[in-house]
């Protein structure tokens, strides 16, 4: 509940009350990182928050905003053929831009993010992170604005995520998810 409330404050309120916050030049954060041990509900929390935000956006009487949920599992992006993983990253962000052009707010949720956005290595070779991480960064910061597009990453191992991904201005809201208690 604590994580949900924190994300709701940062994400839901700015989207639902844009007219007020636009006067203050507040921008919706670009990204969130949910991390914690396996089985603590990172994916479930992310889906629940985004589903709730999308529902509230569509119910808002004065708002014509709609949200679109793009769910991706990190390992599904991996491909042994040169350039295919990068192409899949481009397709995900193109889909988000297409939704944005239609007046919808896209939410990209990447589960098991450490599998594709791991720390780059200094040595040359077939390390997929050496090409996927720069592509991901280029898509997030590129010429075509991702304004009001929210990216959520979920991982068991935040220490494996490349520092370029989790720096301020990209994925800068980090939330630790703890295992559920008997309560």
Sequence positions of predicted segments:
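Walker A/P-loop NTP-binding motif of AAA+ ATPase domains
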Residues: 1-183
